[in-house]
Amino acid sequence: MKCFKNTTVYVDGEGLKKCTVVFDEKIEEISACDCVKADEIALPEDAIVLPGFVDQHIHGAGGSDGMDGTVEDIAIIAKTIAAEGTTSFLVTTMTQSPENITKAMTAVKEYRTANSQDGARVVGVHLEGPFIAAAHKGAQPLEYVKEPDIAAFDGYNQASGNAIRIVTLAPEVAGAEDFIRHLTEIGVVTSIGHTGAKCADIEKAIAVGASNVTHTYNAQSALHHREIGTVGSAMLFDALNCEIIADTIHVSVPAMRLMVKNKPVDKLTLITDAMRAKGIPDGVSELGGQVVYVKNGEARLEDGTLAGSVLRMNRAVQNMVEKVGVPFTQAVDYATINPAKTLKIDNEVGSIKVGKRADFTVLNKNYDVVLTVRDGKVIYQA
């Protein structure tokens, strides 16, 4: 048994409080008393113990990408993102050939079957593409974009060991409505993204089960006073949980403030949407077979299109607090309990509560990650 003794902890339902947390693989006790029989993990005086971060949209890190399609590359991503406090994540794909997507799915199945205890936990897959709108492909390769195909999806899902948790698609394209119904029936989250959808398209999508918006503001129809598009609909409909890349590059600070003011506190989720260059020096990188130039925290294709981020989740939380003006615990919720609810794993992770998994990220006053713990095991220490 281990413990964090007499330190500041973000406790589920109680906010920030000085207490002692006793844990093994799961959280055993949260107490005001520090006279517990457990091995203390010493922390700095300014430490704050938070739930482990949950990243539902990340392509890669540490020089590896989920589309590389190997167990080894997934392991590198998992270990790299532990250093930013992430304890659970979805391996996120992109629009590619069926062969490459299937290869990536197979690697996820193999990795999860092996049940690695190193690095962040792979909860499943976020299938971003190929079922998107060509006109809003962003950094997704055009030649592999296709209309929603239930049989193709089922093949990918089977290859993954039924691990697909989210599918990004454009609801306005032919076949989308039946596809969303299928996803809803099997418990997979439909995320509206890479889309030119109008408000009416999104209303129809919500009616058959769509519940998430992929990297809100980016690669989607903008808000206009005569047609509010995807961005306006994301803010209008409380049924939609909105992902946001809070690096201040993909989305400006005022745009983030607008989103915060127009979404319920439990309907906004921080993502990194990071690509393989996260955690390694600037230079030339790759995304989906395309050359990416990484400089000063920005990843772009040759034509200037943003190609994912190199954002760390602890810095996303910091940006929301210090630049957007969100209360600290609310910003933490955006990176923990909100995505956990979307992925239907909030009974296990996403908050610090007796009986939940012992997943923690420990930050100092500068938002640096001091320690990351998953299932009671230290997976990163500064």
Task: Give the residues covered by each predicted segment.
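Active-site gating loops and adjacent loop-to-helix segments of metal-dependent hydrolytic enzymes
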Residues: 79-90, 134-161, 204-216, 227-241, ...
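Conserved, mostly hydrophobic/aromatic
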Residues: 127, 183, 213, 320, ...
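Active-site core of metal-dependent hydrolases
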Residues: 154, 158-280
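Divalent metal-dependent hydrolysis catalytic cores, especially in the metallo-beta-lactamase
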Residues: 59, 75-104, 120-133, 160-172, ...
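C-terminal cap of metal-dependent C-N hydrolases
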Residues: 7, 341, 351-382
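Histidine-rich, glycine-flanked metal-binding segment
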Residues: 1-5, 9-50
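His/Asp/Glu-enriched, well-ordered alpha-helical/loop segment
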Residues: 232-242, 248, 260-272, 278-363
